[in-house]
């Protein structure tokens, strides 16, 4: 939980690196409950670059609990992005991302529908509350399948 362990990307990397089946649940500053799940391993590596991971089985998804909608992966090559300088990132667009110190910056950018899409139109305002958003809190769980 970021409000306990910290919002820094270092804390996300420390707690989640090399773990798979991660479920991320986020409360935006606009009161939207959104999140994502991926069975892939979050491997950050030792380099300072962004690494996209391919979900060949197309099991990753993002969701909105506020809207009760699930957005399946449509671009397998952009399932998740791992970076030592970011929190969790879903999609190449980025469909859902949590940046370093996400509680103090509007640099959390959303482009829902790029790599994850349910076939219906949705605006950034509907999903995140706005195209750029603060993160009030987020939690990461490892799902045991």
What are these regions (language model features)?
Residues 1-23, 27-145:
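Phosphate-recognition beta-domain surfaces
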